[in-house]
Amino acid sequence: MLALIQRVTRASVAVDAQVVGQIGPGLLALIGIEPGDTAPQLRRLAERLLGYRVFSDEAGKMNRSLADTGGGLLLVSQFTLAADTKAGMRPSFSTAAPPEEAERAFNQLVAICREKHSGGVETGRFGAHMVVDLVNDGPVTFLLRP
């Protein structure tokens, strides 16, 4: 399991030209689910998403987390993150979880984040073709694993 997180001033995701999730300042997290990802890993990733310090404090240092700022969290499932890109000129998706397993894990991650974060948790639509619009603040982008 991995999450590509971006600190944003705003982000939204649309399906069929209709916005299905949007946030103001906060984090956009693209989530890749791999076969065999476990409930403890989901909980750990949720902790990292909410607790990872990527927001500036009064001194300008990255010392504040999403939990500290109360910013929004936009979670978007993206199976291509889990692709094997080591060889050849075409990605292999054999390292991504099957759709049913991935959807179940993604929904569990969303539920955990919603339970723990009062700042608002929005999502895309699992399995849909989505258009993600964002303004990356910094830019600040990190790849997290549980």
From Swiss-Prot:
Family assignment from sequence similarity: Belongs to the DTD family.
Superkingdom of the organism of origin: Bacteria
Name of this protein: D-aminoacyl-tRNA deacylase
NCBIfam families: D-aminoacyl-tRNA deacylase
Motif, Gly-cisPro motif, important for rejection of L-amino acids: chain positions: 138-139
Keywords: Cytoplasm, Hydrolase, RNA-binding, tRNA-binding
A Gene Ontology cellular-component term: cytoplasm
Compartments, record wording: Cytoplasm
Gene Ontology terms, MF aspect: D-tyrosyl-tRNA(Tyr) deacylase activity; Gly-tRNA(Ala) deacylase activity; Ser(Gly)-tRNA(Ala) hydrolase activity; tRNA binding
The keyword Hydrolase is assigned to this record: yes
EC class (word): hydrolase
SUPFAM superfamilies: DTD-like
Complex and partners: Homodimer.
GO biological process: D-amino acid catabolic process; tRNA metabolic process
Record note on domains: A Gly-cisPro motif from one monomer fits into the active site of the other monomer to allow specific chiral rejection of L-amino acids.
Primary gene name: dtd
Provenance organism: Xanthomonas campestris pv. campestris (strain ATCC 33913 / DSM 3586 / NCPPB 528 / LMG 568 / P 25)
Function text: An aminoacyl-tRNA editing enzyme that deacylates mischarged D-aminoacyl-tRNAs. Also deacylates mischarged glycyl-tRNA(Ala), protecting cells against glycine mischarging by AlaRS. Acts via tRNA-based rather than protein-based catalysis; rejects L-amino acids rather than detecting D-amino acids in the active site. By recycling D-aminoacyl-tRNA to D-amino acids and free tRNA molecules, this enzyme counteracts the toxicity associated with the formation of D-aminoacyl-tRNA entities in vivo and helps enforce protein L-homochirality.
